[in-house]
Design a protein with these regions (language model features):
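Catalytic domains of carbohydrate-active enzymes, especially glycoside hydrolases
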Residues: 1-15, 66-67
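Histidine-acidic metal/acid-base catalytic patches
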Residues: 1-6, 106-127, 131-224
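Active-site acidic/histidine proton-transfer and metal-coordination neighborhood
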Residues: 9, 32-127, 133-136, 145, ...
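Glycine-rich, proline-tolerant flexible connector loops at the mouths of alpha/beta enzymes
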Residues: 9-30
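Conserved residues at the C-terminal ends of beta-strands
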Residues: 13, 44-46, 74, 156, ...
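Short, acidic/turn-prone active-site loops that include or flank metal/cofactor-
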Residues: 15-16, 100-101, 155-157
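Stable alpha-helical elements in mature extracytoplasmic
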Residues: 29, 59, 79, 83, ...
């Protein structure tokens, strides 16, 4: 399916490789992705539920074994100093995913930026277009404010910018997709943009193809 979408990079979730599995299974999963021509760029979302060296270390070993340069995470504030220590040890980035108004810890990009202020530059933000807009935040302004702390980007489209249940094919909704890509280019953004297509789970391919086609068209149309 991903090959039909002509993508070369992927963010891996536990559905693809489980953290609790033997590390040999992680290596096996990585080889399977690589054999399919896919490079694993990140893993997660990981919650870092236990504030212990053993648990945090295993999550970083998992990311490293899969060849991921970063971890998408949704931790509690108290765990961040420990995570930062392992970021330095493994040279693996860790970016907090803001989840909108339902998230009691990190609802907005600004809440993430405040949490990682003063920390290692590899501690940052995974900005989600849909959740950010639903939180009542100016998406483009938030991107610019985050600057180099924005290490990862999840893109989705919504027909109703206040309703998470109106997710749709990218380009069919109200999220300013073209402006997003223009802003990323103007910022000289070097991270990944991951499509989150959460529609028609039984037959997602047509919508994925349409989403990638729209995004590639938006990129091609950028002149500055």
């Amino acid at each position: 399916m991903l090959q039909l979408c002509k993508v070369q990079a992927v963010s891996v979730k536990e559905a693809h490789a489980k953290i609790k599995d033997d590390p040999a299974e992680w290596t096996k999963a990585r080889k399977e992705f690589e054999a399919a021509g896919l490079r694993i760029v990140s893993v997660g979302k990981i919650d870092f539920a236990l504030d212990t060296d053993e648990d945090v270390d295993r999550n970083f070993k998992y990311a490293q074994a899969l060849g991921a340069a970063g971890i998408v995470m949704a931790p509690q504030l108290a765990v961040l100093p420990r995570i930062e220590r392992f970021v330095k040890q493994y040279n693996v980035k860790a970016f907090i995913h803001c989840h909108g108004p339902e998230d009691k810890v990190f609802p907005t990009p600004d809440s993430v930026l405040k949490a990682v202020q003063g920390m290692d530059a590899r501690m940052g933000l995974c900005l989600d277009s849909g959740h950010t807009i639903r939180a009542g935040v100016d998406l483009i302004a938030a991107m610019r404010q985050a600057g180099p702390r924005m290490l990862d980007f999840h893109i989705k489209d919504l027909r109703d910018l206040k309703d998470r249940n109106t997710s749709c094919q990218v380009g069919d909704g109200a999220v300013p997709v073209s402006t997003i890509f223009k802003t990323l280019k103007n910022m000289s953004y070097t991270g990944d943009v991951n499509l989150e297509y959460e529609v028609l789970a039984d037959n997602p391919l047509p919508g994925m193809l349409g989403s990638f086609a729209y995004m590639r068209g938006a990129l091609a149309g950028i002149t500055v």
